[in-house]
């Protein structure tokens, strides 16, 4: 399948496709509902899938990740969005020591996606422009 569009449009289409294909897929994050996300990657999801599957969260990356892990352990397929990847580090403990190790700790799968923009070049300064993945190599 070929796609002709922007990176954000491709992400949005992938989310729509996943949510259409599997009713267990849900999205959660800051301002992802009516606002459509910081970079508009979730525009239209709330209108199409409703507030039970498109969940606006408080400004707490730990709460977003913890909720996604819990939802995944209960059979959902959450896609958790960080407004900016800089703040993913605030929830790194949960992603590394709970989500990633659940298989070895409890024999459980955590089918969750944690995503967000990095190094977008939007002039966001030291707390909204970092490419966190570079730090993990």
Where are these regions (language model features)?
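Thiamine diphosphate
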Residues: 1-137
């Amino acid at each position: 399948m070929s796609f002709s569009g922007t990176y954000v449009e491709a992400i949005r289409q992938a989310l729509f496709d996943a949510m259409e294909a599997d009713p267990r897929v849900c999205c959660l994050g800051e301002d992802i509902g009516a606002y459509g996300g910081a970079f508009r990657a979730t525009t239209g999801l709330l209108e199409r899938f409703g507030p039970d599957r498109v969940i606006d969260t408080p400004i707490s990356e730990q709460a977003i990740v913890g909720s996604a892990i819990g939802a995944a352990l209960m059979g959902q397929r959450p896609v958790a969005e960080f407004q900016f990847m800089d703040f993913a580090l605030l929830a790194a403990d949960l992603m590394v020591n709970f989500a990633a190790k659940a298989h070895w700790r409890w024999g459980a799968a955590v089918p969750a996606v944690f995503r967000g923009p990095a190094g977008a070049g939007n002039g966001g300064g030291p707390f909204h422009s970092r490419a966190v993945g570079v730090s993990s190599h």
